């Protein structure tokens, strides 16, 4: 079966969020499972630079300008790049300028991505034509609309990585997209008078997936649906909405051979983790003490991630004897709040503003607890890294967090299921009660080590997701 992924980022060449991790790992896992998989993306500078031996497949004139379709390989996966320098040859973020203003022509840049995804299904490359076109997030949402307009030459799947980003554009651009005029309506891609590339994917795809089963249900509810819940509820009732968990790339995230860790360890050599903790405490200016639990936050610093309540819970956490390390950037008030906490609680709180992939490995390899108190979380990768590294996740019961972390309740401990700490309400009180439970387990080192081993035994490898997507593709292809 031939599968084409349509997306805008690819780890490690270009990443602004978790979408890149999926695009960088899922196709390879699918190829290993026996599928014929390729990826198509805009030819952003970092992608053109990072993919060697690019060959010209086709040159063509389109509604968005002259296109050169390039093809090469990266990590064993075939990659198509849509080369239109006037649209994509811009340094920095693929979505906005250095002043953080979205590019005014984004409507055209990502319409072309969708159109090219559709054209691939219509035979643009004479030597390779997909049976399934798998589009990701709003950037690729129009792919499904173009396929519908062309009488569906391939089956389409649209994966929502985060429903909050909707790809909204002024209705006056509709004629520029070369789609049927009747597509601009409520039963189409119109959303409160605007064009929504996200809604185009949701409405016209043969099947919608999200990145966890719980999030797939949550987005059918007003609290999480961002105005799309009615459409999503109907897709759920039609059996056309499902959740498949993201995976962890075990070539990159594995404490047994992570080159970024000072000391390697596994389930059977957990004592070796202590050296990583000592180095982390030293690097973050904390008192070196293996008797106190280190709580880590590695995240965008936003209220969506629940970090306002995490900040408020710090005094109580420190009073019980813990330490806190923070790595991330985001909202100015949260950045200032965490920096103020580091200044006030010198030696107990360490904060680094910014994001460094290498340092995130050292934090997760050295900390005892990873905090992910999100208000909503489509899947979440940080807690999966924590599980893999025996750094117990402390999470709110939402989205992928609910699907991947089992609370250290007495029942779960007895049944061998416990892997972390889960709280329900997005409040300081609820988080603080969960923190107290962390300290109770911490006071029993043998039990703590038992839960660490449980967590590290869980399998969230990409091969699991690859098999789930393969079964979905097969079901769509044969119906």
Swiss-Prot record:
Family from the record: Belongs to the glycosyltransferase 1 family. Bacterial/plant glycogen synthase subfamily.
InterPro entries: Glyco_trans_1, GS/SS, Starch_synth_cat_dom
Keyword entries, A-Z: Glycogen biosynthesis, Glycosyltransferase, Transferase
Pathway where this protein functions: Glycan biosynthesis; glycogen biosynthesis
Catalytic activity: [(1->4)-alpha-D-glucosyl](n) + ADP-alpha-D-glucose = [(1->4)-alpha-D-glucosyl](n+1) + ADP + H(+)
One Gene Ontology cellular component annotation held by this UniProt entry: cytosol
Domain of life according to the entry: Bacteria
Residue numbers binding ADP-alpha-D-glucose: 15
Disulfide pairings: none
GO molecular function: alpha-1,4-glucan glucosyltransferase (ADP-glucose donor) activity; alpha-1,4-glucan glucosyltransferase (UDP-glucose donor) activity
Record HAMAP family: Glycogen_synth
GO terms classed as biological process: glycogen biosynthetic process
SUPFAM superfamilies associated with the record: UDP-Glycosyltransferase/glycogen phosphorylase
Record flagged with keyword Glycosyltransferase: yes
Gene3D superfamilies, per the entry: Glycogen Phosphorylase B
EC number, as in UniProt: 2.4.1.21
Entry protein name: Glycogen synthase
Role of this protein: Synthesizes alpha-1,4-glucan chains using ADP-glucose.
PANTHER family the UniProt entry points to: ALPHA AMYLASE DOMAIN-CONTAINING PROTEIN, GRANULE-BOUND STARCH SYNTHASE 1, CHLOROPLASTIC/AMYLOPLASTIC
